[in-house]
């Protein structure tokens, strides 16, 4: 029983290296070959619409039973009848849960039995090339034509209820399709980046080997030589000068005012005495009549007396109205009524028409008043 155990381990270790197209006849894989021979029957079942893609759990359980059947055939206990029974059990487990009529099931079993191939010569389990199997399911896409094992070949009964999740996890079933197997299981190694031609940014590697020399600087304390120092602006020319302010002596001497002379000759009349007390004020009457002369000869006519007071204004009564005569003799008599109320209320004849047609104006009072007014106005004007 140790040999089947060892072969089962080899299958588990090399499950990732199996190819889909490489199917070889090896010892203990007659059940896989039987399944390959039944490809036509499975395709016919798919065309009829009966088969469906199995679930991952069904396929995993089928591979577990397949591994057990292979181990039994190794021991020599397997026969044609047992192989047939194992094939029936595998197809029942690997097929989906869809129901099918019993007639089709019998036809699939009948076609599967004559398609069996004779067992291949046994090979030692320690051979360099691990056994390969193309009948793996669980990860293949349902639409790929090269994966017949992914779809059910014959209708089968529902999967057995007793399943071991631990054994399912142990058996590895990579996908059948070559594209999915290469992309998922065999990931290409990522090439390492070429770091020889990598350049740093902003030329930082140009001074990569530079070592700062700050630590090599020595600070030496030297005394300053001030012998050749020259002062600014010639201040050193009088460096030995000693101020003489300390030797000055302040001597107090009285001021001699005997020879002092006053300004502006004020001392020349210092002995002068004012003689204002001896002045006498005399009052004399001035004779303006004899000595004083008027300006512009105004005194020449000082004795003139205007003669305006001797003038007389004479008034003469004009009688030209009374003496006036009309140019034409119209034969009417002019009656003059005096404004003075008198006893005689009869109208008075102002004029009499002469034979020549002239009017006698001797007795007209209006003309007399007019003459008086004219003479009065002339008297006012001084004529």
UniProtKB/Swiss-Prot annotation:
The gene is MAPT. The modification Phosphothreonine is found at residues 53, 95, 111, 117, 123, 147, 154, 159, 173, 345, 369. This is Microtubule-associated protein tau. Disulfide bonds join 233-264. Tau/MAP repeats lie at residues 186-216, 217-247, 248-278, 279-310. Residues 1-27, 72-91 have a biased composition (Basic and acidic residues). The modification Omega-N-methylarginine is found at residues 97, 291. Expressed in neurons. Keywords: Acetylation, Cell membrane, Cell projection, Cytoplasm, Cytoskeleton, Disulfide bond, Isopeptide bond, Membrane, Methylation, Microtubule, Phosphoprotein, Repeat, Ubl conjugation. The modification N-acetylalanine is found at residue 2. The modification Phosphoserine is found at residues 127, 133, 137, 140-141, 144, 156, 177, 179, 204, 227, 231, 235, 247, 266, 294, 298, 338, 342, 346, 351, 358, 364. It is found in: Cytoplasm, Cytosol; Cell membrane; Cytoplasm, Cytoskeleton; Cell projection, Axon. The modification Phosphotyrosine is found at residues 18, 29, 139, 336. Residues 1-198, 340-359 are annotated as: Disordered. GO terms for molecular function: microtubule binding. Residues 343-358 have a biased composition (Polar residues).
């Amino acid at each position: 029983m140790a040999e089947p155990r060892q072969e089962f381990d080899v299958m588990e270790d090399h499950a990732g290296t199996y190819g889909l197209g490489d199917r070889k006849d090896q010892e203990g894989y007659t059940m896989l070959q039987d399944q390959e021979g039944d490809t036509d029957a499975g395709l016919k079942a798919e065309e009829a619409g009966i088969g469906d893609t199995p679930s991952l759990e069904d396929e995993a359980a089928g591979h577990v039973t397949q591994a057990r059947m292979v181990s039994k055939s190794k021991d020599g206990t397997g026969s044609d009848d047992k192989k047939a029974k194992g094939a029936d059990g595998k197809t029942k487990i690997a097929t989906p849960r869809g129901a099918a009529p019993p007639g089709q099931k019998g036809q699939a079993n009948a076609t599967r039995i004559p398609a069996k191939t004779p067992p291949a010569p046994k090979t030692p389990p320690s051979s360099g090339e691990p056994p390969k199997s193309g009948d793996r399911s669980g990860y293949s896409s349902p639409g790929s034509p090269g994966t017949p094992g992914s779809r059910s070949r014959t209708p089968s009964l529902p999967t057995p209820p007793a399943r071991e999740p631990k054994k399912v996890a142990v058996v590895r079933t990579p996908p059948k399709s070559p594209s999915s197997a290469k992309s998922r299981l065999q990931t290409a190694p990522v090439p390492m980046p070429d770091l020889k031609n990598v350049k740093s940014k902003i030329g930082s590697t140009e001074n990569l080997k530079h070592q700062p020399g700050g630590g090599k600087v020595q600070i030496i304390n030297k005394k300053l030589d001030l012998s050749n120092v020259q002062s600014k602006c010639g201040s050193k020319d009088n460096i030995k000068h000693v101020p003489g302010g300390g030797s000055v002596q302040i001597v107090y001497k009285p001021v001699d005012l005997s020879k002092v002379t006053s300004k502006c000759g004020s001392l020349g009349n210092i002995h002068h005495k004012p003689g204002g007390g001896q002045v006498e004020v005399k009052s004399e009457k001035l004779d303006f009549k004899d000595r004083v002369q008027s300006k512009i000869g105004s005194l020449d006519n000082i004795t003139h007396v205007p003669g305006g007071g001797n003038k007389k204004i004479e008034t003469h009564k004009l009688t030209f109205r009374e003496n006036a005569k009309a140019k034409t003799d119209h034969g009417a008599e002019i009656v003059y009524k005096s404004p003075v109320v008198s006893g005689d209320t009869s109208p008075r004849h102002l004029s009499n028409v002469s034979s020549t047609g002239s009017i006698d104006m001797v007795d007209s009072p209006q003309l007399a008043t007019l003459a008086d007014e004219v003479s009065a106005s002339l008297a006012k004007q001084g004529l």
